[in-house]
Amino acid sequence: MIYWIFLGLAIIAEIIGTLSMKYASVSGEMTGHVVMYFMITGSYVMLSLAVKKVALGVAYALWEGIGILIITIFSVMWFGETLSPLKIAGLVTLIGGILLVKSGTRKPKQPNRHRGNRPPSVQGLKTQTTGHHKGVAVESGEHHAAA
């Protein structure tokens, strides 16, 4: 859970840093650059902590994707940037991509283990040895090296 918090903090720091960069370029104030340097550095530090347990592809997709989405919204509100139909389509596609990448990280269901310790592919096979052929024990369709 803490690694997801690190990822959230990385996203927030990236958003603040990038918006500070835009603010500095529009206003000419050095404060924006100073905030940008600290926030972007903090963002990478938090991201590096997050990827210890969060899959890199997922972490990076969320970090960049959510960052782009929120930065675009604030750029329209604060800096008067335009939001064309193509940009909106791109953002919708971005959201879909983030959801697909995130859903691809779900752990597969564990197979039923109540039938014994054999893998599911051989659970239904009989285990009676039917004979030996050239040093190989033949067990109902399975071949095992004879001891």
From Swiss-Prot:
Subcellular location: Cell inner membrane
Keyword annotations of the record: Cell inner membrane, Cell membrane, Membrane, Transmembrane, Transmembrane helix, Transport
TM helices/strands, residue ranges: 1-21, 31-51, 54-74, 81-101
Membrane topology term: Multi-pass membrane protein
GO biological process: one example: glycine betaine transport
Pfam families cross-referenced by the UniProt entry: Multi_Drug_Res
Composition bias, Basic residues: 105-117
GO CC aspect terms: plasma membrane
UniProt region (Disordered), positions on chain: 105-147
InterPro entries: Small_drug/metabolite_transptr, Small_multidrug_res, Spermidine_export_MdtJ
GO-annotated molecular function: amino-acid betaine transmembrane transporter activity; antiporter activity; choline transmembrane transporter activity; spermidine transmembrane transporter activity
PANTHER family to which the protein is assigned, alphabetical: SMR FAMILY PROTON-DEPENDENT DRUG EFFLUX TRANSPORTER SUGE, SPERMIDINE EXPORT PROTEIN MDTJ
Family, per entry: Belongs to the drug/metabolite transporter (DMT) superfamily. Small multidrug resistance (SMR) (TC 2.A.7.1) family. MdtJ subfamily.
Chain's role: Catalyzes the excretion of spermidine.
Subunit: Forms a complex with MdtI.
Protein name: Spermidine export protein MdtJ
Lineage: Bacteria, Pseudomonadati, Pseudomonadota, Gammaproteobacteria, Enterobacterales
